[in-house]
Regions:
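Phosphate-binding loop of NTP-binding sites
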Residues: 3-164
Length: 164
């Protein structure tokens, strides 16, 4: 076990507990922020430990519904996916999902990862998780102040996918 892993996992979980207990957020983002600050390689390491690999999905609409249906199908097929079902679809949310779905030694309690990702954060997720399967949904003009035009987002997706 990497020395930074235990403090990152423990203190990340503690941050989530305090966030929920004190009513400061829902505990879906802050734990991941803390864990990644303490161990920047946490997500990539835990993704690599998933026997069946990672499935990433992104798009403007339908991510949560599709991810939940796919999670049910995977479970019916005998898989044990780690899934960010709370809808926290930035890397911090993926890190938080791993915090609660891994033991304090950093061993995931699942055989696969199923992560819905925000359109702008998808390229980073590809780099960190090295997915075996990618599902791309529709792409519409959404949050232009943050993402720019559809062509910009699509170009970033293409660059990320070419690295696989």
């Amino acid at each position: 076990m990497h020395l930074a892993r235990f403090p990152a996992l423990f203190l990340g979980r503690l941050a989530g507990f305090l966030s929920r207990t004190l009513g400061v957020g829902g505990g879906t983002t802050l734990p991941g922020v803390v864990a990644q600050f303490l161990d920047p390689g946490l997500v990539s390491t835990l993704c690599a430990r998933l026997e069946r690999g990672v499935i990433l999905l992104t798009g403007t609409n339908g991510k949560t519904t599709t991810a939940r249906m796919l999670a049910l199908m995977l479970r019916e097929a005998g898989w044990s996916p780690i899934h960010n079902r709370a809808g926290a679809n930035l890397m911090e949310g993926v890190a938080t999902t791993f915090l609660y779905a891994s033991d304090l030694r950093g061993q995931p309690r699942g055989d696969s990862g199923l992560f819905e990702m925000d359109e702008a954060h998808f390229p980073r997720a590809v780099a960190l998780c090295r997915p075996r399967l990618v599902l791309l949904h529709n792409l519409f003009r959404d949050q232009l102040d943050r993402y720019g035009e559809v062509d910009t987002v699509a170009g970033r997706w293409g660059q990320a996918l070419r690295t696989l």
